[in-house]
């Protein structure tokens, strides 16, 4: 698994990892593309997911309970064209990519971009702290279910 929800690496680093996986005869790549601290895949119907959710102001350093932050902006996301390129690159190496889009929890980045998606419908910032966040999609709202379907339609 590569956790780019928290730490965006970029296309060239992913390709290096896929090359190493192929060398080791590994055939499944679990790609963690969203989490509380970052949204890394373009969803054309919801551009704020990457505009807001693809960037955080700082990153917690040390263990999960640390109050030390690096003070550096961390950002990045993949366009749909880049995702297709990486999927093709993996397929040529007999590697299947399994993308992960977090839900119903670990949704802080989406809720920072679109507050109406959350259970509390309040404005939040993309978290800089790791560990448990308490923001989840309001799956009782049909509009949120439609959002999830829209996202999955573009991912699949």
Regions found by a protein language model. Give the residues of each.
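Active-site mouth loops of central-metabolism enzymes
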Residues: 1-13, 134-143
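A conserved hydrophobic secondary-structure block that centers on an alpha-helix together
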Residues: 3-36
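Active-site-proximal loop/turn and secondary-structure-junction residues that shape catalytic pockets
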Residues: 6, 33-37, 45, 101-107, ...
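Phenylalanine-focused residue identity feature
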Residues: 7-8, 29, 77, 130, ...
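Short, glycine/acidic-rich beta->alpha junctions
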Residues: 9-14, 77-82, 146-150
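An active-site-proximal structural segment forming one wall of the substrate-binding cleft
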Residues: 24-29, 83-104, 135-156
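Non-cysteine beta-strand/loop elements that form the S-adenosyl-L-methionine
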Residues: 31-32, 50, 54-57, 98-100
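Aromatic- and acidic-residue-enriched carbohydrate-binding clefts of CAZyme catalytic domains
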Residues: 37-92, 109-142
